[in-house]
Amino acid sequence: MFYPDPFDVIIIGGGHAGTEAAMAAARMGQQTLLLTHNIDTLGQMSCNPAIGGIGKGHLVKEVDALGGLMAKAIDQAGIQFRILNASKGPAVRATRAQADRVLYRQAVRTALENQPNLMIFQQAVEDLIVENDRVVGAVTQMGLKFRAKAVVLTVGTFLDGKIHIGLDNYSGGRAGDPPSIPLSRRLRELPLRVGRLKTGTPPRIDARTIDFSVLAQQHGDNPMPVFSFMGNASQHPQQVPCYITHTNEKTHDVIRSNLDRSPMYAGVIEGVGPRYCPSIEDKVMRFADRNQHQIFLEPEGLTSNEIYPNGISTSLPFDVQMQIVRSMQGMENAKIVRPGYAIEYDFFDPRDLKPTLESKFIQGLFFAGQINGTTGYEEAAAQGLLAGLNAARLSADKEGWAPARSQAYLGVLVDDLCTLGTKEPYRMFTSRAEYRLMLREDNADLRLTEIGRELGLVDDERWARFNEKLENIERERQRLKSTWVTPSAEAAAEVNAHLTAPLSREASGEDLLRRPEMTYEKLTSLTPFAPALTDEQAAEQVEIQVKYEGYIARQQDEIEKQLRNENTLLPATLDYRQVSGLSNEVIAKLNDHKPASIGQASRISGVTPAAISILLVWLKKQGMLRRSA
């Protein structure tokens, strides 16, 4: 039977991609349905209990700047907050938080259940309704049919998921959850390229069986960082430390002597695993010269005794897992409460997607999260938000939107996936972005909140706070520009006490702030330049904008030069065999990838600068040289 009411957008899957997609579509006023196999696992952290990190924290801030959920949820659930790379420049500083799994799930579910225009329904999806190469709905396990103008697939590792522990394996979407086999078969019938990937998770340990007294502690930062631009540290629950132990030669001997029982090394697992989050058996074999690896013992929550040993992801048999765990300091009597495992699953080649994350072949069908070959909650959330907002726009007959590489890490992520594809689980790093100085965590709102407002993602409260911050930045910069101190002034001695070289001429507040030894906090403690802003976010922006002004201007020039060709559109129907002068290799690659723009084409391996020049000349001759806005 058909459900009586049609929807604008259907989201299939309630993980980190699905929840952001559902919230985005509903915030934009579209009638949205979130279908999940289990309402109790909405926002579930399937692997590590943490949000953020290098590159990943940047994505979380961008999701937040566009009105998303993840940053707000972790502010309510984070039990340890740290700034990584704090001693380095602002471009690579990143926020990371340990999470209480239960509090995080509660925060996500509460947000979903209180979101207007959003209905949640518990049923596994087994089929899609596709008519004339357009998706028009979904069919659940019990045969109930839902109609919609757009469908977003955010099914994580559930598509034909297979769990491996040692040489034993069984079907599963993750531990304790069934796989999605009928939907996997249905998707394989569509004209989409499909592959297999794998990921893994470590065994969970009973904290009561660990001797923490012999282990080093790792505390969070004080003052505590905050993830959301709308958040504050008072929202954070109780803060707790993590602990550090190490593998040793005994651990490595156990692993080496049992490799024949590893499904990965025995050839049972076909899927490719994540390069930057390898299993412990992979680390021991790939880095044979290392006699130890650092392992972080991370609490799973304030009311749980489970510990997540970050760094020993494994699919070795349970008896070997016990030996590995008990070989480490402080863990000699440790008990495992959940075994580690590897999971293999289907993913679909993201080169078959438009930058909006809509399929090139099935109109109205969007893909987000691990189904696109990524790994990580943050990468999934960012894709979910983008797919959700574009599904909402499509259902309202509006043009899609995707950020450029120069606008956001989300733009880098989507461009990498849609242009280059991936053969292994894709993880975001700051090193993937060409314009890191522009794409900082601290300015994600300055880059994206205005766009989010235009798209209908940003509510009145966030918009008012954003504009207040902009005014504070502008007013403070004007104040510092127009406040001067001379070498002969009474205040000069006070100022000179904080400078490596005394004043030799008149200097403004901004002149002084540009000096390496001067900080905004120090400057505004001096009589001529007091008082400091009470708005800490605005104060941080003032300091960064002043200190890095020259570098930022230079990078902006680079972006503008690049954009002239970047935004030159390529017709979707263009057969590159028509373009004389291109090599057979370039023709084959361009016809295979079907890039949307010259920028995308230039990033395809094997497409040379000479080929790009030929293409630009040909487009001009044909009168087809068009640039996107």
UniProtKB/Swiss-Prot annotation:
Main location: cytoplasm
Any Gene Ontology CC annotation: cytosol
Subunit structure: Homodimer. Heterotetramer of two MnmE and two MnmG subunits.
Pfam family, one: GIDA_C_1st
Residues engaged in binding FAD: 13-18, 125, 180, 370
Record bears the keyword tRNA processing: yes
Cited InterPro entries: FAD/NAD-bd_sf, GIDA_C_N, MnmG, MnmG-rel, MnmG-rel_CS, MnmG_C, MnmG_C_subdom, MnmG_C_subdom_sf
An individual GO BP term: tRNA wobble uridine modification
Keywords assigned: Cytoplasm, FAD, Flavoprotein, NAD, tRNA processing
Location(s), subcellular: Cytoplasm
Binding-site residues, NAD(+): 273-287
Organism the protein comes from: Escherichia coli O127:H6 (strain E2348/69 / EPEC)
Official protein name in the record: tRNA uridine 5-carboxymethylaminomethyl modification enzyme MnmG
